[in-house]
């Protein structure tokens, strides 16, 4: 440093090693400026006098110009370039003065030069991540924590910023679209209050149970669906806003989650066979904490030193995993995935891979979540909790591109309910590879529905239910007369979210009630569907309950409750199942309540997110349906005090006539082969009470 300040830098200064220096911290030092003439050099340092120097000089003695205000080459040291000039940015020639100003140089010219091999930093997708797929949009990326990275991601190969592609908003005024602004914060607060999730204590956050985990997942799904409806109304379908990420982020910010404590073994409240449509659902209930990485692990002190042990893995096709026969899984370690720049490398025995290797020797149980493609949404996935496995062995081998990868063979712990095996069996039934055991009729509907409904009994020798006539929809003796003609929509291509010119959307409070996947986005007292006078086609989103069941269903014999109904396909929360078909009868004009649906009974509300400002919130007349002599598959749906299906009142209007229907929707995600049940309601007169055999934790002991 001294040499740089001396005019003669050839002779190094002599150092007096006998002097004792008073060393002080930098923050205690004050700048010392050259003493003016006539003043002692040891006096108290004074502030430097203010000197205004123009960029081009003249400069006071001892002050050198710096780039970009550097003197020209003829300033006294010809042939020497400034050491402060960035490489690749030439000095400006010619006389240096205001008459000839220099060109401005951007600040990014001062960046550190790149290496010859280019930037080898992390690519946009972490190399140790398992593939991450949701049923919305794949543009966002999550780290292994909970921070969302959505914009301005640096591309290491080009140096250009690359992030979520911004989709131009549709010209709302030109297309007749009116954005509906809704504050979601009060909506979330209302949901959390209704489900008693405000200010969860630390004990429940650390260790949950089935009831709490169910409430957390239900609030997440209700809130996510409502935000999907709001986003589509504002930006149109396919806006790619990822309401699942926003909903989960808001919930976790408010501390709404459970099973935060990492553990080996099952997560409390999560049953083997439970399904999830979003990776964030796994995080909220503590089944698998990382939002992208396929391996979750924890540090355990078993000896003098801590060592990592795997607690859960997600196998969803990101690597060359082998699903085996349902009890065996060959899992590929993380890392070594080909990057965007084409580089490939060997996997390393670190982090998750090291934890799996340690678990081989410790023989601890590992939770396994299998991901399968969502047939209804090709870019999405469904995550199945397949229970506990143990790692039997591990080895290294070459993959398809010649790099070393780690392989782990996991065996399922015996004695657990079947989960992934059920999915494989159902696929074999659909493909005709294997036959369904106990089939009495291959299609109970005789072709009346678009999907066949088989009749199955693998319990006893009963050959089927009592005879009835299958009718796919509701029969009215006469429609309900409206006091004034109802408006009909003119959406030739189908009703679209945010279209203020659509009369049916206006009747639903400015929102379409269904998503493009047929999911009910918000629960209302009354849903207005398109009627026969509307111009939209039969496949319009607002005719969801008019097309019959979308899932492959079966009627089966239960062990102690007669015949029941279940699905071969997974059903999303809010997914449409079927309508209650039969004959509309007068209220109170029935003595036998078997195969009766009575809308006048008292039903427990599902949630607090109801539009109580809706003028049509009350049923205009008591709706009672009898399916004893004629009906559809809904007549086989049994009662439960903790149901997984909820009914909604739907009206279809045409001119001055209207018909009311009962449509069933899934309350939460329903895995295949789980019985579909709904609450039959409470009779106001408390008549015809029957013993309940639903077996749920909240069973009342009776039903009507």
UniProtKB/Swiss-Prot annotation:
Biased composition regions of type Basic residues, renumbered to the chain: 159-170
Record-annotated residues binding Zn(2+) 4?
Answer: 641, 692, 694, 699
Which keywords label this protein? Chromatin regulator, Chromosome, Metal-binding, Methyltransferase, Nucleus, S-adenosyl-L-methionine, Transferase, Zinc
Q: Which domain of life is it from?
A: Eukaryota
**Subcellular locations according to the entry:** Nucleus; Chromosome
**Annotated Zn(2+) 2 binding sites:** 489, 504, 530, 534
Molecular-function annotations in GO: double-stranded DNA binding; histone H3K27 monomethyltransferase activity; histone H3K9 dimethyltransferase activity; histone methyltransferase activity; zinc ion binding
* Tissues and organs where the protein is expressed, per its UniProt entry: Expressed in roots, stems, leaves and flowers.
Q: Where exactly are the transmembrane stretches of this chain?
A: none
Please name the GO terms of the biological process aspect recorded for this protein, alphabetically.
methylation
The reply to whether Transferase figures as a keyword in the UniProt entry is yes
Q: Where does S-adenosyl-L-methionine bind?
A: 561-563, 593, 595, 635, 638-639
- Provide the Gene Ontology terms for cellular component: chromosome; nucleus
- Stretches of the chain forming a coiled coil according to its record: none
> Could you tell me where the Polar residues compositional bias lies?
80-90, 109-121
Pfam families xref list: Pre-SET, SAD_SRA, SET
Query: Could you tell me which InterPro entries the record lists for this protein?
Result: H3-K9-MeTrfase_plant, H3K9_HMTase_SUVAR3-9, Post-SET_dom, Pre-SET_dom, PUA-like_sf, SET_dom, SET_dom_sf, SRA-YDG_sf
- Which reactions appear under catalytic activity for this entry? N(6)-methyl-L-lysyl(27)-[histone H3] + S-adenosyl-L-methionine = N(6),N(6)-dimethyl-L-lysyl(27)-[histone H3] + S-adenosyl-L-homocysteine + H(+); L-lysyl(9)-[histone H3] + 2 S-adenosyl-L-methionine = N(6),N(6)-dimethyl-L-lysyl(9)-[histone H3] + 2 S-adenosyl-L-homocysteine + 2 H(+); L-lysyl(27)-[histone H3] + S-adenosyl-L-methionine = N(6)-methyl-L-lysyl(27)-[histone H3] + S-adenosyl-L-homocysteine + H(+)
Q: Which residues hold Zn(2+) 1?
A: 489, 491, 495, 502
Which positions fall inside the SET domain? Answer: 551-681
Record text on subunit structure and interactions: Interacts with LHP1.
Q: Which PANTHER family match?
A: HISTONE-LYSINE N-METHYLTRANSFERASE SETMAR (PTHR45660:SF13)
Q: What is known of its domains?
A: The SET domain is required for methyltransferase activity and ectopic effect on plant growth.
What's this protein's name?
Answer: Histone-lysine N-methyltransferase, H3 lysine-9 specific SUVH1
Q: What is the lineage of its organism?
A: Eukaryota, Viridiplantae, Streptophyta, Embryophyta, Tracheophyta
The gene coding this protein: SUVH1
